Amino acid sequence: MVHFTTEENVAVASLWAKVNVEVVGGESLARLLIVCPWTQRFFDSFGNLYSESAIMGNPKVKVYGRKVLNSFGNAIKHMDDLKGTFADLSELHCDKLHVDPENFRLLGNMILIVLATHFSKEFTPQMQAAWQKLTNAVANALTHKYH
């Protein structure tokens, strides 16, 4: 289990309160699909993902990105039990979707990059460390059901 300090909890929660989930989620997922094009295979139903502009303008990418980032909101509410919080999603991604668990870490990195671009002044090294710890812990929780 990952332990978050009071300072880390405050840092994560204070920034999260300012996050536009739709914008940051959509940009994070779009960035993942562009930077790591092999991840596109999990999103065949999204239609045209053949270019950066197609991905950035794809409404399904934005909607799903919001859904993914909302799960981080759930993580922030349950930072003391991330494995329990993500148990069902871990099982889904492992047993049904067969997602390479490395993709969770990659997406976490994309979220950090997008947060840094949107909140550059507030995204101090301490803020980054707290968010990096959270994204790593979520990625770890999502791999919990993998065999």
From Swiss-Prot:
Heme b binds at Y64, H93. InterPro entries: Globin, Globin-like_sf, Globin/Proto, Hemoglobin_b, Hemoglobin_oxygen_transport. GO terms for cellular component: haptoglobin-hemoglobin complex; hemoglobin complex. Keywords: Heme, Iron, Metal-binding, Oxygen transport, Transport. Pfam families: Globin. Red blood cells. Residues 3-147 form the Globin domain. One of its GO terms (biological process) is hydrogen peroxide catabolic process. PROSITE patterns: GLOBIN. The keyword Transport applies. One of its GO terms (molecular function) is oxygen carrier activity. PANTHER family: HEMOGLOBIN FAMILY MEMBER, HEMOGLOBIN SUBUNIT EPSILON-2. Belongs to the globin family. Hemoglobin epsilon chain is a beta-type chain found in early embryos. This is Hemoglobin subunit epsilon-2. The lineage of its organism: Eukaryota, Metazoa, Chordata, Craniata, Vertebrata. The gene is HBE2.
